[in-house]
Amino acid sequence: MKYYIIATRVNLSGYPETFTISYDNEATDDYDNFMFFDTEEEAQEWTKSKQAAEWKDCTFEVIKDGE
């Protein structure tokens, strides 16, 4: 199984926007560009990384691919 991360933040209009993080540390909705992890633990570790810190005001959720 593979895992990926969903990020959510409140946009300037006050509404939540949800997106996935790409390998380039960009927001994406393109499945082919999702940053995948081999284990849930690796994905959880990413949420505490310097890359994740660049996404200020975001909350992260680890998703199992195929759910």
Predicted regions and their residues:
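Short aromatic-glycine-(Arg/Gly/Cys) micro-motifs in beta-strand/loop hairpins
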Residues: K2-Y31, K50, F60-V62
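Short, mixed-charge low-complexity intrinsically disordered segments
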Residues: D32-E67
